[in-house]
């Protein structure tokens, strides 16, 4: 069910139903659970007419056996109400939603997550039935809980603003807060694992982190105990004990709030990573320069939203694309950016589609163009599939042809890059944290690099790759999803080692960049030396540039499985120090003072499926460690192109520090694009693979 294999699940549920009915009788609670699931599968398969009977039978069994106020009754009520809502039987749905909410409030207390879910369900129902004024107070209640669902609150807040039920300022700030809290979840895995590592220490931060973990564990245990208690028959319940547990949960919430304030004062870096306070419009505007515009995106089920902010103005508009439609368009947009496939394609079908690039510009930036188009720099905070979209390759004017007759024709497209430098932020709060610490002195050494790691000893090349011939190879590899290599509680490293292609040309890339920036051979780590052991033992804070030319691994589309990671040499005997995977939580423990962290060699930004949010967790961890900006590849990069773009960017910034990182990258890409010595130079896959993540301005 969780993987949406609904058709496969149906016969299994039917079999389970037959077994339970035979073994336990037709009115056993387990039978009701299976019936409820069967009805849900029917709904998911768009068979509404078939769904009603099993859900109603489930409800009847639960009411009879468990009692009318049992939490499981609320579950059946909620599913039946959702079915009626989908059928637009609003008069039938509303009392069921309200009864489900009342049951959960009585049984679980007003602050329980299930109560927030029921409140969200009722709020969204009222909104879709045209009653925004009734939906708004319920949506605001979920916002206060900190557990608001973006798909619910954003449409309601947007509609309330349009209907003047909320002031512009209040609606925008509440929407911004909801978006920022939603963004935190995408990096939660790395943050949680970092907290575990920090808690193992003996200093003041470790003490506070351990206390937070203990309180969270106690609250979770009490919550489970309450659910178990209220699931019993009325005669078996200890109501006084339940009330004491609820009181203790409330006290824990207060203690944790105080602890967060202490962390914010004593360890602001950690607090900004683990539990950042949302920024409002008035907090953001002073952080922007006069030449900057910030666009913040949130994409939910059926629509998306963009909030544009400059020093002097703000706008909030709807995007006419929902999550699925946008994911499909971003995937189609990226197809022409695989160099190997573009060259091998017969005809023009494999080449980059300028018309689609313009269509996405109109949808994503067109609604706020009046506020943003005259700014020199655009700061983008993407979400969902937009994390996989290279915004600088959007086209601002309708092209003469979707695919030019010749590659040179791409040079004349109205690329957004010609108008603005683009930088990406993994979260809204990162603007504040990066600019607060952007004035540190840079490292004293130019660069250290890690590349051509050994994944499979059987495929290992020459021991000394520093003397490589300099031959350039086009890389055509995909970011690997953890979910392809998951075994039990960990990654199957043997299988991963066999699957990861070796990257011999990255040795040439690293050596070329090192020569250009003046780094010594001793600072370039190749082959087996490109390992976690070498990295963790190095004095990384002395380097201005830290360069990784290797594969990125993303958590994939199954949440909770691992962290985004960088693949280094896989050791013969994995250890806690070195297992070959540099995870986001390990990155956060590094001590950096780098102007740049470069992630080259693969499409580190996104996985095989647009929306696999590797960006947020990995980038936030590098920023926490002390990096000011990341230069990250969107797709498999030609080694020569990677070298040319990175060295040009570094040289431009060195010669003109006042232009800032984003403008330096922009000029490097435009110089490549406008180089008429080869038709290939005009093709966006060659000049446009890198995105700047983090601080792009002069600080």
Identify the function of each model-found stretch:
Residues 1-4:
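Alpha-helical segment of the N-proximal tetratricopeptide repeat
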Residues 11-12:
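Leucine-rich, hydrophobic repeat-scaffold detector
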Residues 254, 267-699:
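Catalytic cores of enzymes
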